[in-house]
C-alpha cells in the first residue's frame, strides 16, 4: 500500500487485475494513515464480495543513519569518519568530531570490530572499520557517495545485539492486532527464537495473526530449516538479503529457501525488485519477467510488489503483467512433476490424517473428470496442505470465519469463502454442493472432491473425503 493506490477504486482495479492481498509497510506512515488504508481495503473487499489478507510488515531492528536535519554527508573515498550514537557520545561527555556520521544504534561500538564492513543506502556506499574506541567506531570510506538522513545501514556477517522487536515494533504489533490485520511480518529474523518471541507477544495481546518470517540476514539463511519449522509463512526479502550476502548468491539462496518451505508445507513469498523498472516504465524488462517466472517455477506461493505499486506510475499495469507472467509460467510447469518432487522431499507427516487426506484429494483431482476440490476448514490447515500438493484444479476453502477466509489468500490456488454453519455430515456436504453451484464455482453435473472433519460437533480434524456431483 502507498499513495499511488490509496483509494477504494484503485484497490478494486488491482484486485480485478490479479492482486490477492495487500501489505502495510510499518516503516513508513503513521497509524492514522495505515488505519485509513485498512478501511479502504476492507471497503473494497466488501464491494467485491471477496476476502483480502492484509500484512503488517514491521520495521524490525533496522539500523539507520540518524536525522541529519536537511543536511547530507559527502563520503569521499579514502577519507576517515567517526560513527557513533549521539546519545552515547553525550553520556560519555565527549565532543562530536568533524567527520562524524550519527547513527541510531547505541550498541555499534560493542558489536563491530576492526576489519568489519558497513554498508550504507542498500550497499551504495561502503566503509571499513579501522579501529573501535567506544563510543566511536572509526572507519575509512571504500566506496563514496552522498549520504542522506535516515538511510539504512547493513553490517554483513556481524551479529548485532539488538532485540528482534524494537519498541516501535511492539506498538505496531498492538495496532495490527487491534485492527484485525491477518499477518504480521517480522523483519531481520536471525533465529527461530525471534519468531517464537513475537508469536508469544501476539498471543498475549489476544491476537491470532500468523507470523511471516522475513529472511534477509546471513544468520537466518544458516538457520533456515529451524526458522521454517516455527514460522507460519516465510518471505524471501531480497532487498536487504542482497546487501548482506553477495548478489550472485541470492538466486541459489532463494531456491533453497523455497525448497525448504515446500518440504514443510509453509507458504513462501518471493519479494523485492520483481518488476522494479515498472516504477517508471509501463512494461517490465525481459530479465524481470524471467525473475518472476523462475520464482514461480521454483515453487513460490506468492510474489510480492513493493514500490512498483505503492509509489509507482503504473501500478495497474504492473499487477496485470505480474499475473500474466505467473499464469504463463504455470502453464508450462509440470504440476505432476512438482507434486512428485514435493512428496519425495521428506515432508514431515502430521500426527493426524489431514496430511493423507490432502495428498489423496490432490491425487484424485489429477483425473480429468474432477473439476475442483472443496474443503470445509476451521483453521485453513487442510486447504494449505492441499495447496502444497499443487493440484491442477481450483481449491475452494469454506469456513465459518472471515479471518480464516482471509488467511487463505496467501495460499497458492486457494479461494477462501464464508459459509453458514451447517448440521450433520450429510447435510453439510449437500450444503457445500449447493453453495458451490450458487456461487458459480462449478456447474451442474461436474464432479468435485469434498473434504471435511467428522463428527462436526467435535470440530474434528479433516478425516473424510468424498467425490460428489454438483446438483
Give names to the regions the model predicted.
Residues 1-471:
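Non-catalytic helical/linker scaffolds that mediate oligomerization, partner binding
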Amino acid at each position: 500500500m502507498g499513495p499511488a493506490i490509496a483509494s477504494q477504486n484503485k484497490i478494486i482495479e488491482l484486485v480485478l487485475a490479479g492482486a490477492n492481498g495487500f501489505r502495510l509497510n510499518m516503516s513508513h506512515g503513521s497509524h492514522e494513515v495505515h488505519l485509513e488504508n485498512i478501511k479502504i481495503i476492507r471497503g473494497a473487499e466488501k464491494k467485491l464480495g471477496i476476502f483480502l489478507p492484509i500484512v503488517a510488515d514491521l520495521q524490525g531492528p533496522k539500523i539507520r543513519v540518524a536525522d541529519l536535519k536537511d543536511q547530507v554527508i559527502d563520503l569521499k573515498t579514502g577519507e576517515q569518519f567517526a560513527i557513533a550514537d549521539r546519545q552515547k557520545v553525550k553520556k560519555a561527555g565527549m565532543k562530536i568530531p568533524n567527520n562524524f556520521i550519527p547513527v541510531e544504534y547505541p550498541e555499534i561500538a560493542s558489536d563491530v570490530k576492526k576489519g568489519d564492513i558497513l554498508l550504507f543506502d542498500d550497499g551504495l556506499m561502503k566503509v571499513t572499520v579501522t579501529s573501535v574506541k567506544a563510543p566511536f567506531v572509526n572507519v575509512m570510506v571504500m566506496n563514496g557517495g552522498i549520504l542522506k538522513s535516515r538511510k539504512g545501514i547493513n553490517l554483513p556477517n556481524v551479529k548485532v545485539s539488538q532485540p528482534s522487536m524494537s519498541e516501535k515494533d511492539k506498538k505496531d504489533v498492538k495496532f495490527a492486532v487491534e485492527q484485525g490485520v491477518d499477518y504480521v511480518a517480522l523483519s531481520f529474523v536471525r533465529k527461530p527464537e525471534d519468531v517464537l518471541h513475537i508469536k508469544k507477544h501476539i498471543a498475549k495481546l489476544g491476537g491470532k495473526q500468523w507470523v511471516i518470517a522475513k529472511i534477509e540476514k546471513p544468520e537466518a539463511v544458516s538457520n533456515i530449516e529451524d526458522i521454517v519449522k516455527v514460522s507460519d509463512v516465510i518471505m524471501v526479502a531480497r532487498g536487504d538479503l542482497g546487501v548482506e550476502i553477495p548478489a550472485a548468491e541470492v538466486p541459489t539462496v532463494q531456491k533453497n529457501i523455497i525448497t525448504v518451505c515446500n518440504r514443510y508445507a509453509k507458504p513462501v513469498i518471493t519479494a523485492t525488485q520483481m518488476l522494479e523498472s515498472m516504477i517508471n516504465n509501463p512494461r517490465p524488462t525481459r530479465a524481470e519477467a524471467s525473475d518472476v517466472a523462475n520464482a514461480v517455477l521454483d515453487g513460490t506461493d506468492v510474489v510480492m510488489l513493493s514500490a512498483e505499486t505503492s509509489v509507482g506510475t503504473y501500478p495497474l499495469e504492473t499487477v496485470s503483467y505480474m499475473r500474466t507472467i505467473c499464469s504463463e509460467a504455470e502453464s508450462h510447469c509440470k504440476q505432476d512433476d512438482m507434486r512428485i518432487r514435493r512428496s519425495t522431499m521428506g515432508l514431515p507427516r502430521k500426527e493426524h490424517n489431514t496430511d493423507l487426506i490432502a495428498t489423496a484429494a490432490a491425487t484424485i483431482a489429477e483425473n480429468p473428470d474432477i473439476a475442483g476440490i472443496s474443503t470445509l476448514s476451521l483453521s485453513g490447515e487442510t486447504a494449505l496442505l492441499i495447496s502444497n500438493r499443487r493440484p491442477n484444479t481450483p481449491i475452494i476453502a469454506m469456513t465459518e470465519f472471515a479471518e480464516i477466509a482471509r488467511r487463505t489468500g496467501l495460499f497458492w490456488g486457494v479461494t477462501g469463502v464464508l459459509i453458514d454453519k451447517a448440521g450433520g455430515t450429510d447435510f453439510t456436504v449437500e450444503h457445500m454442493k449447493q453453495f458451490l453451484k450458487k456461487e458459480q464455482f462449478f456447474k451442474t453435473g461436474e464432479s468435485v472432491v469434498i473434504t471435511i472433519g467428522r463428527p462436526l460437533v467435535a470440530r474434528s480434524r479433516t478425516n473424510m473425503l468424498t467425490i460428489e456431483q454438483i446438483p
